[in-house]
Amino acid sequence: MIIYRDLISHDEMFSDIYKIREIAGGLCLEVEGKMVSRTEGNIDDSLIGGNASAEGPEGEGTESTVITGVDIVMNHHLQETSFTKEAYKKYIKDYMKSIKGKLEEQRPERVKPFMTGAAEQIKHILANFKNYQFYIGENMNPDGMVALLDYREDGVTPFMIFFKDGLEMEKC
């Protein structure tokens, strides 16, 4: 299994269990997820080490809640955040500088294609700004990558967009 981590915050963003494809000329990765529902807080009586009490009233056990969301977000503990268009422009400008710095250290041949492609991709993001929900890694580092969540034309299938050069891969 391959875990994709944020190059700056080192937060886990997603893994290779999802359908992943390169978009924007290889600049970004599009990761397709699905909506899932999970029950949390429900504890099986057998795990407590006994049977339901014959003396107590019925249904007094543990409470459970059902949480529905996108599997990528839930599995990797991504945190939703929000941006105005102006705030996102400021964030993305600083983020691009950070990634450019990392690339200059680690992969200098990627600097020019990244900066050229990123400018185009950012124009596309800003043109479709209202369609996106924004997610950051579990540690909520404001300097880290902000992943974009959108839905396919069917309105049901979620997908997330990540800048490929802002990720590091870790084999497990």
Curated annotation (Swiss-Prot):
Pfam families (UniProt xref): TCTP
Subcellular location: Cytoplasm
Residue ranges of the region described as Required for reduction of TSC22D1 protein stability: 70-172
InterPro entries xrefs: Mss4-like_sf, Mss4/transl-control_tumour, TCTP, Translation_control_tumour_CS, Translational_control_tumour_p
Primary location class: cytoplasm
Phosphoserine sites (modified residues): S46, S53, S64
Xref: SUPFAM superfamilies: Mss4-like (SSF51316)
Described purpose of this protein according to its UniProt entry: Involved in calcium binding and microtubule stabilization. Acts as a negative regulator of TSC22D1-mediated apoptosis, via interaction with and destabilization of TSC22D1 protein.
Quaternary structure and partners: Homodimer. Interacts with STEAP3. Interacts with TSC22D1; interaction results in the destabilization of TSC22D1 protein.
Protein's UniProt name: Translationally-controlled tumor protein
Gene source species: Oryctolagus cuniculus (Rabbit)
Gene encoding the protein: TPT1
